[in-house]
């Protein structure tokens, strides 16, 4: 939630190292004492010549560990012999079990050259990773490794960024250093770090390479002077801890990645409803009025959010006593809960250095970051001068739990249903070296002035309570391995990554801060700060509501964040370019980074949206997994009911989304169990079709639904690509035989979006929508059967209580259609009173041989609908012929 305050901030120390190949100047390493076993290989690596000390001191002795972990995964780790160099703590990213594989059974093979040491990873006769001809550099503050790539590779990943889904391959640098990035500019480092890339080689398969390293880094993709393609890692520290994984398809590769970083967390049923927020709701009356206006406009609103406006002078764990008084806030939350709706607020990591409970408790427990002389480390953010929680502190979880338990107490506080965490890169408005945070806060009016107090709501809100109507330190540790080498320059390392903010410490926490506990340096762990806050926040939410799935939406992420939280794509702006790029961002996070609860601020956060853009975005946003309208205080209000066409678009969007909610829930659950992505680029389902490799404006919503949005203003048509397959128009049911070519879809109203069902699919939908997901769960089901080219179709349905981390009972159905017969089988543990009331078979030109009161032909849709009354209590079979 960075605002215009930072737009004029100067870049500090923005030196950039050129593309010089230092590997040719450095001696590399020699492998000795090589030992090979059934499932592993180890070796000693010794510096092979005179140190070059390019950006630090060359380490003379390294270790090599190779593990054949499974038949599809290979672990290659190069680290210092003394294990003093920092490694990502297992408490942050638990390591996958490395036992059980063998070199003979593995699809991946490790080959090496001893002197100078280099290695290759092969799949069959194909080389996937090749470091030959470029010497390994392993220095105290700089590591470099280059791999050769095939010509014109199809590379994806290396987030977070707003560049193209398929990465550029010439003069391209991806910098990974989490930062507060207003307007999410292209070709810059953004909020998260995901050092994994996927190399898709068409019919030969897909493989991924994950570097488990949290230090700042530049990953360069370019060609040599003689045209040879390469990818090069340049990191500020850590070790080379690689995981190579392979699959026959991109989807298979994504599943393997999930096994390394952890399966995503399952979300509650209600979280897939529509959410509304805005930075700038002036008081609790305005929040209530927005809730009321949505109900009057007949636009379903599942969850209402409040930004930092609710806080007393922007201080976390406080309420503005005049604009958001506790009594009225509790009334608001009770009203929402009584109407089966939900409430979420924001919590930032930075705690105001002032007399408040969060600060006083933190100081008493010593859980804030300290400088190396033991004094409190201070920055400046929204509340003014701030302290920052140390997520490595042994007592940090207790502190965080206590703050949540007190402030969000259902009986005495604000009983939230989910949590929004922001500014957790961590952001610091005060530029480095920030020697006078008090002066900076004073000069920049932090905290900003609050709006005038309103004694009551100026307009009546029927149904709301009367109050909403108009009135007549722990000791630092220096011991332990894998913590980091001594005597490093933690502020200005010799090699400078291309951090858009300039120096490493600019607009964030100083990188020379040493954390409590093991004594990790912020220099090494900066990119983990947001994910560690995410984990602590998820734990705190579970502590206050044991057994219930906690929704936590975060801005800053690291690899594996999806196991704890969802992610919104940050402070975008109301432009068509950001509308378009949200698609590729969403696909990267959901399918490649395994963070499937994902979405962009619908209609844009910064600037002023337009009626057309917001109407189109409402339709697109309904196909994010996380669907929220949100914008900033200086922009015009953009709630969906503000414009007639946007309201109509939103109603249509939510109607389809809610009818599909169980399809969404089922596919999302599958990803949390297996890693199989729900949201997918086209090439995930058509991996041999080269025309899909660069397509980033269409996507699959599960395996069954192809979404092809209009992507520019003043347009009513879209050139949509249809692979060699059969598809059915969602609205008309008309069959479209794809031929591996573009098809122009015309006359697309601003309130519509082209949707097609992929042949071979059976989709369970609710028979009608509802105003809340609670009411939706009472609606019956309809099955839509879209036969494939071979005349068959299949699908699934998963149901549970919608909220429990470990449901007591589940319903897991499999649908198959073949030769006019529909079969339903599976696990029937979860009891529900709803039934399958109808089955619609697409692609039909004649009615079924059923009586008219049972079956009907919709010639306009080319579909036959058969009325049914199937209980979801046991297997069944229906003759649809």
UniProtKB/Swiss-Prot annotation:
GO molecular function: alpha-1,4-glucosidase activity; beta-glucosidase activity; carbohydrate binding; hydrolase activity, hydrolyzing O-glycosyl compounds
Chain intervals for the UniProt region annotation (Disordered): 440-485
EC class name: hydrolase
Keywords on record: Carbohydrate metabolism, Cell wall biogenesis/degradation, Glycoprotein, Glycosidase, Hydrolase, Polysaccharide degradation, Secreted, Signal
Domain of life according to the entry: Eukaryota
Gene Ontology CC annotations of this record: extracellular region
Short name of any one Pfam family annotated for the protein: Glyco_hydro_31_3rd
A GO BP annotation: polysaccharide catabolic process
Family statement: Belongs to the glycosyl hydrolase 31 family.
Name recorded for this polypeptide: Probable alpha/beta-glucosidase agdC
